Amino acid sequence: MASGDVIVKVADKETLDRTYANTNAILAAVGEDVRVKGVKRYGLKINKNDSNPATRCTYLFDAVGMTPAAMNYSTGAFDFGDWGDVFFVKNNYPAMVRYDGTEDYKLDPNDHTKKADGTTASDVANTAYGGNAMSVFDGSSDKGKIWLSQFEIGNYEYMIISNVQYDESYNDDAYVREDGSHADKLYYPMFGGSYDGTRIRSLAGQTLMYNTNASTEITRAKANGNGWNIGSWSKRNLLDCMLKIMSKTDNSQTAFGQGQTSGYVNDASQNYGHLATGALTNKGQFFGYKDTTHEVKVFYIEKWWGNRWDRINGLLMVGGEILAKMTPPYNLTGKDFEKVGITFASSGSGWQKGTKSSRFGRIVNSTGGSSSTYTCDYFWWNAGITAVALVGGSCSNGDACGADCLNLSLSAGLAYWHVGASVFLEQPIAA
């Protein structure tokens, strides 16, 4: 045999037949497994060098060719495009949830003042009810949890959602309980947090809670019972990604509604202009207005931006350096948080321009944009303190508000007219 000759060994027929049979068996098993057979990936690629909030976004994987979702301001109806039957949209529903975490009953999706039967009155505005109105994302059984992958390559950022953990880059941080176990459902508040004298509530027809510091907000949220707390960065980031992928734009206000971003009055007797909760109980899963005087609603959640700032866990600025913790337990000092690789000097503010996508979500890393470019939202920071994240903006912030609107300039001890928090729930572990 000459040097350099290649030897190819061919298995005998019996071995080949066994391999063929085994392969067919594996493929058949995979075909019968809905969780594998029905794998979906909906991705968005964002060009950092394109300042246009719409053209900078390109669909990837199963999202390619889909019509984006957006509010139709001419008809006054939300247009789901091709997204109405996507798992994280169709498996989202409004429900009343007891303090112990038990789902009591579903609400009529188009009129939350009624139960799902469309006739029986609900407790959505009943302060005597022992629980809260929550937006539920059901990932149980074969429905599929919302797995998220975020990263960047060169001048492109990527956010991809799947109904399975497609590979190791996909996380379910928003589902992680304080004991480290993983839930199958997510519970977001349908309404901005109000206060009943004991606890933060998510109910319609209530005055928003404000002028509270972080410790008070957390204490009042936890007063609902085990598993209740204020919001977190991982939950905020996940839902923001869902909105961006659905709408194929970085301008959340154009796609979903401006939100109440005006109306401030310097009068405590008028609650400084904050709208009461429940303005959109008869407006379905998504709804918004082009003007600045009405609420916005996404995934049955009112006030995702505007009206009042919401303080959240899991994102801090300590000495100018942004730190994140994607799963509980949380604290207000930065202990056990991780560096996200973004640092700002001194203090300041500006329209967001650059953003960084990583395992820690998508976070602003430079300013210089405008209300109609890049993320179209504003950022405040203070490098001289330990700042706790505020998100969404208030009724005095105008175009600065939005899904990406972020404030890292105020300490945990700050209590002010435009700051409060809302109540979230981790799914209880089944008995």
What is each residue range found by the language model?
Residues M71, A133-G180, G227, S347, ...:
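Carbohydrate-recognition beta-sandwich/jelly-roll modules
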Residues V124-G131, N163-W304:
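Short aromatic-cysteine micro-motif
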Residues V318-P329:
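A short, polar/charged loop-to-alpha-helix boundary motif
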